[in-house]
């Protein structure tokens, strides 16, 4: 059976739709709370920064699970990892469905996140190992499109359910998906590949990333203790990186980062993902907090720009094959900076149609950045390091999303608290806070443009 699967035979093709459904479920669960943060903050009487742990905490656990997935696939096999992922999605959704308070809701989200980390890594590994080489790129693009579809559909569906049925009902959807996947997978999914052994060390990732995103989220509200926590998080992550370099069988092999071309390419991917995921949270907060829209309408306004991002991902891959990274990625960051600047100007008026259009421009720019930067970064390495580099990329995407979300929502939350304490109306405080976050985002996009120009120019000169 192994030979047949590696040749991309009927058995592998029969299992691919089920695994793509796993990718959809993972991405749907990942972004389902982006639209619900204001309601959660109001319901439980917590700040936006605290409510945002439903997103940032999710990313921390997902990043750890991605790093852990390679070990589990070797040790337990695909079928067992599939059941662990589905079980985590079902258990986490069940906890959140009946959560009586914020902390039980957060616990449910953290359990859900195990599913996202395991599925993202497992599906990519399955495609890389079992697709016919001539079809591998198509299958990877199909998986990326499935993930993008989940991210685009989730805000609309979640907003509709949240508006019509309330917060508890929101978690019935991923629970039903998990049960359906478990039932189908029990009969359809077959084991793939030999099993092995290895060591695992995820605790330092959880502690380091947790401290890092907490410090970023609170530093604008309570600077001194938050800076101490932030420094502790950086120190723990540094210890984790050192351990991965000296361990015989590391949880995450970081040696590809010794290649400067790969490291800078990954930096561009992370900067792009910080902007992309943060927009997916900040725009609903603006629509709901500053303009008073329902969660459903906020999700519907976000869906078009996110779909534009998914389409530009595909276009970006084709343009990369034709042109290379120059001038594609610098143009992408330029579009992103332009779109963010127009969003900031239009939001203060407010000019809703222009905000939506400009956010679509920013998302299109990000689509021209992330996938081409990832492909270019991987191409700087020998094939023997592709698997390790792919794990690094997947983990870094979750880390960047957590850092970006924590930073921007932390700024917005601090501004809303400060504004309302000065007597500003809640909507005006949200408007001012959103403008502040856009200024920071524009600065990051401009700095990213400069880095991408230097990187693309260097690669172009090397190729002659």
Which functions belong to the PLM regions below?
Residues 159, 163-268:
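Hydrophobic transmembrane-helix bundles of small-molecule transporters
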Residues 1-9:
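Short, Lys/Arg-rich, polar N-terminal cytosolic tail immediately upstream
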Residues 11-28, 33-37, 44-92, 104, ...:
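12-transmembrane solute porter fold
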Residues 3, 461-464:
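Short, charged juxtamembrane terminal tails flanking transmembrane helices
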Residues 30, 34-38, 91-97, 147-163, ...:
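Membrane-embedded alpha-helical segments in integral membrane proteins
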Residues 65, 118-119, 144, 150-154, ...:
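Membrane-embedded alpha-helical core segments of multi-pass
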